[in-house]
């Protein structure tokens, strides 16, 4: 594959600008995977700069599963109504709603989890490791690892994205921020399941 074709391929895959893609490829020695990683890191840096800006516009994304037994509403905010009408933004809202329907998170971010719940889970994991005969220090390290897994189960932003499990939901949002150029925030969601 020529350099030009590689640049074009990465632009389409990442939504990054041509010069950003070219720089990332040059920095990565024209290694496609390393370049994608660099673009993701740089996208995250762009996203971090925009994170302080207030997001008050947006849409309510929705998804009803084909069996009509699971439905989701998700409030996705951005800075301007222009972006709220953007197809990329609207598709992100729909994808997030579908993800929530499939993965059933309980919280948007780790900050929403009550401290008592986190400590309770941590103590359960420590006790389980101690019951397996592990020393206290090792048990605490094991508990931290299991707590990280727990966060991936219950926190939307920490979950691997249902359409591409190599990307966490928060990274997907950072990529969208980098492409759109505005802060994007998942404000809240509500998941309904028949009989649950």
UniProtKB/Swiss-Prot annotation:
Keywords: Cytoplasm, Elongation factor, Protein biosynthesis. GO terms for molecular function: translation elongation factor activity. Residues 80-83 are annotated as: Involved in Mg(2+) ion dislocation from EF-Tu. Its main location: cytoplasm. It comes from the Bacteria. NCBIfam families: tsf. This is Elongation factor Ts.
């Amino acid at each position: 594959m020529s350099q030009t074709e590689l640049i074009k391929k990465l632009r389409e895959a990442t939504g990054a600008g041509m010069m950003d893609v070219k720089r990332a490829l040059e920095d990565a020695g024209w290694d496609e995977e390393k370049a994608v990683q660099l673009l993701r890191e740089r996208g995250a840096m762009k996203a971090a700069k925009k994170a302080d800006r207030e997001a008050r516009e947006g849409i309510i994304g929705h998804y009803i599963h084909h069996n009509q037994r699971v439905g989701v509403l998700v409030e996705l905010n951005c800075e301007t109504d222009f972006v709220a009408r953007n197809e990329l933004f609207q598709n992100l809202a729909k994808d997030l709603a579908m993800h929530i329907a499939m993965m059933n998170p309980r919280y948007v971010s780790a900050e929403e989890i009550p401290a008592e719940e986190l400590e309770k889970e941590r103590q359960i994991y420590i006790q389980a490791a101690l019951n397996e005969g592990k020393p206290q220090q090792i048990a605490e390290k094991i508990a931290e690892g299991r707590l990280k897994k727990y966060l991936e189960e219950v926190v939307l932003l920490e979950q691997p994205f249902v359409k591409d499990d190599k990307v966490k939901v928060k990274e997907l949002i950072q990529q969208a921020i980098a492409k759109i150029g505005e802060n994007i925030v998942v404000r809240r969601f509500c998941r309904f399941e028949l009989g649950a």
